[in-house]
Each structure stands twice: as structure tokens, then as C-alpha cells.
């Protein structure tokens, strides 16, 4: 399964990343997930903040810091999902921190 990640930026002394995976390929995925996360220095774990994926049969957005919120359905392709989190990562990092 192809995947990649890149640094989105820094917020409140945390470095945020966007990771993306697609199966079977980036240009025609049957399944995909694009995740915003940071690495927690103390716990040495990756903390997922937000994710766009199609794991429930439709493309949706999960704000992982608000587990009780329903999934937000979105009409995005894989590459649009990557662009969405790349452009808006700071909004979700801030919401996660507040």
C-alpha cells in the first residue's frame, strides 16, 4: 500500500505531520486515509488529531479530539483530502490544543 508523509508545521512547540495512504494506488484508490498527527515526546506515541478517509463506505472527516461528534461526510478525492489537511492543519491543531 503506497504511503507518504510530510511536515505540516509547528504549533505550540509541537511538530504536526500529514500522512497519507492509498490502496491500491494514489491515483485510483479503493481505500484511503489522510491523517494529521504529532509525535508526543513524553509518551513516544503518535497522537492523531484529524483524519479524512473512506473506511465506512463514504468519504468522511473525523475530528479525533472530539470522539463524540458524528463523522462529517465530505465530497473529496484522495488528493483533495491531502490538500484540505495541508491547508487547514493549523485550525485542527489549535482546536485539539484548546
Language model: regions and residue ranges:
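A short, structured beta-strand/loop element
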Residues: 28-68
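Small/flexible residues
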Residues: 9, 14-16, 23, 53, ...
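Acidic, low-complexity intrinsically disordered segments
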Residues: 62-98
Amino acid at each position: 500500500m503506497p504511503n507518504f508523509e510530510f511536515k505540516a508545521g509547528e504549533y505550540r512547540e509541537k511538530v504536526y505531520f500529514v500522512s497519507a495512504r492509498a490502496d491500491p494506488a494514489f491515483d485510483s484508490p479503493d481505500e484511503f486515509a489522510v491523517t494529521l498527527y504529532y509525535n508526543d515526546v513524553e509518551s513516544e506515541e503518535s497522537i492523531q488529531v484529524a483524519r479524512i478517509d473512506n473506511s465506512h463506505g463514504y468519504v468522511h472527516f473525523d475530528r479525533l479530539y472530539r470522539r463524540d461528534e458524528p463523522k462529517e461526510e465530505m465530497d473529496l478525492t484522495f488528493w483533495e483530502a491531502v490538500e484540505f489537511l495541508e491547508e487547514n492543519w493549523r485550525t485542527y491543531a489549535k482546536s485539539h490544543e484548546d
